[in-house]
Every structure is written in structure tokens, then in C-alpha cells.
Amino acid sequence: MAYVEMTVAMMKQFGVEVQRPASDTFVIAEHAAYQAREYQIEPDVSAASYFYAMCPVVGVPAKVCHVHWESLQGDTSFLHVLEQMGCRTEEEPDGIRMYPPTEGFLGGVFDFSAFSDQALTL
């Protein structure tokens, strides 16, 4: 998810609706106000990806606490790349656990344009 989309999603989580009459236009009500609430700050999925990338290389499972598929961060897409390369994932209550490939690490062609920071990790 692009940073602008992440910002809009977080604004909504805190009670501010953003209208999008056009792809390049954002409208916020004049008297919109943020609402205080408890909020679990997501870990940096970009940094977490190094641990997930070690899983197939070292051959051991890896889990980073509080990384979940519904993350606002686009870097979770990197985990799907690792799945396509033979890894298996399970979402647990406290994070995504990745298991190494059982039949070798597969190659492939991948589009990293939505999560370009991870191209070097791979």
C-alpha cells in the first residue's frame, strides 16, 4: 500500500473520513476531529523481511511478532513472493510464521514495484 493510502487508512482508524472524488483529490470535512483510542503500532515490515528472508536460506521457521496480513504496509507482499518460491506461511494470533520450502527454493519473475525496498532483500 502506498504511503498516501496508509495515511488515509490510519486517519480513518482515528475517526477522520477522507473523501476521494477523484484519484488526485482528497476532501476532509471542515470540523473533522481525530478520536483518541488504543492503537497497536505495527512493526516495520521492511525490517522484518530480513528475518523472513533468512527462513529459506537457513532452513528454519521464522516469525516476527505483530506482523499480520492486514498490515497497512505494502512490504507484506514480500511474504507472498517467498510463498511463491516454496515457503509456507501460517498466521498465528501473535504474528505470521514462515516455514522453509520442503522441496527446494523455487525461482521466478516478480514485480517489486509496490514494495521496492524488498528487491535487495531477495
Q: Where do the PLM segments sit?
A:
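Short, structured segments at the rim of ligand-binding sites
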Residues: 1-122
